[in-house]
Amino acid sequence: MIFYLDKMQPKGSIVIECGNALLKNGYKLKIFNTINFKKSMHYNPLSYIHEEKDILKLVTTLMTNTKGEGQGGDPFWDKAERLLLTSLIAYLHYEAPVEEQNFATLLEMLNTMQVSEDDEDYQNPVDLLFEDLSKKKPDSFAARQYKLYKLAAGVT
């Protein structure tokens, strides 16, 4: 069982209240602390993905726990962020070698996603990656999510 310590449970009250009972019943606990990473168990949440719903759950958790205090967020940008993160994590899960299925690679992908205001046809490395995936596997979850992200981004 994985517990995410976040702004909703900053003191870990759920872990404190339920942790021992879960351990006694054979559960293994993993703590992912998005407030203080030094107190986190330093595990890789991407290695616990088995299907699409796991990707969606992880993205929801990341977005919920990394939003600033009192920030409601514009639904348009929230949707675009959700689609982008979902597509990138799905790509890593389904297409990348196991050793690249981690947050470091996810951040590298995000960092290469520059845009060119002068050239509408410019494609960054991630665009090219997904263009290739769409040709090889047009029905892949990752390719479909990225296409939706690009459609949403094109609206702005």
Where are the regions that the model predicts?
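Switch/coupling segment of Walker-type NTPase motor domains
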Residues: 1-91
